[in-house]
Amino acid sequence: MATLIFVDKDNEEPGRRLASKDGLKLGTGVKALDGKLQVSTPRVGKVFNAPAVPKASRKALGTVNRVAEKPMKTGKPLQPKQPTLTGKKITEKSTKTQSSVPAPDDAYPEIEKFFPFNPLDFESFDLPEEHQISLLPLNGVPLMTLNEERGLEKLLHLGPPSPLKTPFLSWESDPLYSPPSALSTLDVELPPVCYDADI
């Protein structure tokens, strides 16, 4: 079904008043009254003392539109009224603002007592000057900590690292290289396997 478009002068522009499909089915009529177009709908039920002149139709968001148009007409943004200040009040305010700012000499004295913390200081390891690690190609080598000094000497005299000759470094207790007494404690008697039981 086609919709009807009417011109409405209340909105200050060629607005659109759409007649709904239900209104067209009920037989709504359009009446001109004092240059304004009004839509009248049939009333259902009893009507007591019906007015002779129909009321103007209510516009949606009418007050919002009016408020938005007022600043546009003046062309200036609205500013709140500021009370006029005398010379004494201005000087009092300026002295208050100057006294609230601390002097630059005594600002933050606790910064001088601050000890800087650098986490890289805990990652550095000291080596004696006679050992030169700069000759070794150490790219890709993980950080290793050796408990014994002789392990460090072995590492420095190995030469360039190669995948074929890797020295054994005991990082943890390895059961293959542990003494036989430790292996004997690990042997436990297990019960005999029973194959006859149905599972």
From Swiss-Prot:
A motif (TEK-box 1) lies at residues 68-70. A motif (D-box) lies at residues 58-61. It comes from the Eukaryota. Signal peptide: none annotated. Residues 7-20 have a biased composition (Basic and acidic residues). One of its GO terms (cellular component) is nucleus. Keywords: Acetylation, Cell cycle, Cell division, Chromosome partition, Cytoplasm, DNA damage, DNA repair, Mitosis, Nucleus, Phosphoprotein, Proto-oncogene, Repeat, SH3-binding, Ubl conjugation. A motif (SH3-binding) lies at residues 179-192. Its main location: cytoplasm. A motif (TEK-box 2) lies at residues 91-93. GO terms for molecular function: cysteine-type endopeptidase inhibitor activity; heat shock protein binding; ribosome binding; SH3 domain binding. Residues 1-20, 68-105 are annotated as: Disordered. One of its GO terms (biological process) is mitotic sister chromatid cohesion. It holds the Pfam family Securin. The modification N-acetylalanine is found at A2. The modification Phosphoserine is found at S162. Interacts with RPS10 and DNAJA1. Interacts with the caspase-like ESPL1, and prevents its protease activity probably by covering its active site. Interacts with p53/TP53 and blocks its activity probably by blocking its binding to DNA. Interacts with the Ku 70 kDa subunit of ds-DNA kinase. Interacts with PTTG1IP. Regulatory protein, which plays a central role in chromosome stability, in the p53/TP53 pathway, and DNA repair. Probably acts by blocking the action of key proteins. During the mitosis, it blocks Separase/ESPL1 function, preventing the proteolysis of the cohesin complex and the subsequent segregation of the chromosomes. At the onset of anaphase, it is ubiquitinated, conducting to its destruction and to the liberation of ESPL1. Its function is however not limited to a blocking activity, since it is required to activate ESPL1. Belongs to the securin family. PANTHER family: SECURIN, SECURIN-3. This is Securin. It comes from Mus musculus. The gene is Pttg1.
